[in-house]
């Protein structure tokens, strides 16, 4: 892969003190070209998921209805339901927004944005439009220093050095994931961001006005706990954290794919971002020679455990590339 680890990784049992630096292109574009040349029928999988709208509408309705039922519940009950139920729904919607960022519900981009704003409602915090801007750069510039905001900052990586700090980082990783690009690579908001913000504030205010603060708190708690020490959140780590220096993207082939828009098929997704999650398994079926030899996971919970307990793994365990030089 043409990668080199930073100082401190060479010694067994010691956490890296720098990222893994790659001096080759990210692997997905090359693999995409090879697979399409060998298996051109892959192109038949391209295009929107016709059931995306119905699936999103069902989850949004169920989560908002649940929030209204908990308006007079105890805080213990609200937190319990949020962790064991609401977190799965809100994380499902977060990954629906990921799907929509690739225009995989409709062929018209603006329709996907509107559906993303709708899917955003139970999450409680406006993020759909902003996520799309940064996520597409993650695909186009995977690992590129200063552009790919999926990678932890230097401050995060230097602060998180042991089991305890990694545990805290995992609990709050959703905050780091959301706030990192706003500090490191802020983008000026546009009309779509303001639309997302206004509609979200209207929903939040309506929840408080008609049902009380506890209903809104349930929605936000569902988002927070579902993005931390939670099985669904394991994909944040499993996708690109390097447990093997020879591989920078990892797939997950476990049952939670059914609830997460099959985001676990992450090598397949980066190879073919125009294929909706419901069809990604077919990529592996058509071209098994490209995927069966790659390391993969069957448990996101195990990935979280490995990340926390392995003393050689931490926020520095990511592959990075130097930004391309601009023509003078």
From Swiss-Prot:
Motif (Histidine box-2): 135-139
Motif (Histidine box-3): 266-270
Gene Ontology CC, one term: endoplasmic reticulum membrane
Any Pfam family hit: Lipid_DES
Transmembrane stretches, start-end: 50-70, 78-98, 114-134, 164-184, 192-212, 217-237
GO biological process: ceramide biosynthetic process; fatty acid biosynthetic process
Record-linked InterPro entries: DES1/DES2, FA_desaturase_dom, Sphingolipid_d4-desaturase_N
One GO MF term: sphingolipid delta-4 desaturase activity
Keyword annotations: Endoplasmic reticulum, Fatty acid biosynthesis, Fatty acid metabolism, Lipid biosynthesis, Lipid metabolism, Membrane, Oxidoreductase, Transmembrane, Transmembrane helix
Motif Histidine box-1 positions after renumbering to this chain: 98-102
Membrane-topology annotation of the record: Multi-pass membrane protein
CDD domains linked to this entry: Delta4-sphingolipid-FADS-like
Subcellular location: Endoplasmic reticulum membrane
Similarity-based family: Belongs to the fatty acid desaturase type 1 family. DEGS subfamily.
Purpose of the protein: Sphingolipid-delta-4-desaturase required for the biosynthesis of delta-4-unsaturated sphingolipids and derivatives.
Name this polypeptide is given: Sphingolipid delta(4)-desaturase DES1-like
Lineage, top ranks: Eukaryota, Viridiplantae, Streptophyta, Embryophyta, Tracheophyta
């Amino acid at each position: 892969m043409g990668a080199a680890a930073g100082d401190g990784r060479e010694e067994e049992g010691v956490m890296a003190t720098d990222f893994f630096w790659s001096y080759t292109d990210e692997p997905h574009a090359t693999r995409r070209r090879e697979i399409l040349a060998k298996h051109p029928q892959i192109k038949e999988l391209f295009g929107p998921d016709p059931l995306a709208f119905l699936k999103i509408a069902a989850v949004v309705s169920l989560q908002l209805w649940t929030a209204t039922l908990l308006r007079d519940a105890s805080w213990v009950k609200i937190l319990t339901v949020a962790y064991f139920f609401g977190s799965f729904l809100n994380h499902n919607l977060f990954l629906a927004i990921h799907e929509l960022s690739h225009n995989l519900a409709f062929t018209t981009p603006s329709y996907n944005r509107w559906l993303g704003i709708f899917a955003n409602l139970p999450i409680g915090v406006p993020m759909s439009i902003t996520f799309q801007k940064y996520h597409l750069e993650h695909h186009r510039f995977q690992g590129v220093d200063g552009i790919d905001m999926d990678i932890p900052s230097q401050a995060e990586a230097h602060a998180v050095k042991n089991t305890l700090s990694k545990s805290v980082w995992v609990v709050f990783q959703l905050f780091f994931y959301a706030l990192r690009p706003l500090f490191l690579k802020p983008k000026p908001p546009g009309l779509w961001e303001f639309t997302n913000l206004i509609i979200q504030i209207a929903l939040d205010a309506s929840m408080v006005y008609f049902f009380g603060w506890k209903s809104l708190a349930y929605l936000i708690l569902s988002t927070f706990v579902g993005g931390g020490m939670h099985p669904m959140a394991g994909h944040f780590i499993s996708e690109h954290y390097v447990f093997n220096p020879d591989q920078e993207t990892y797939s997950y082939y476990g049952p939670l794919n059914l609830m997460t828009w099959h985001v676990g098929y992450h090598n397949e997704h980066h190879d073919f971002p125009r294929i909706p999650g419901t069809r990604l398994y077919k990529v592996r079926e058509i071209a098994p020679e490209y995927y069966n030899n790659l390391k993969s996971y069957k448990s996101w919970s195990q990935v979280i455990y490995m990340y926390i307990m392995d003393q050689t793994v931490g926020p520095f365990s990511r592959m990075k590339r130097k930004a391309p030089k601009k023509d003078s």
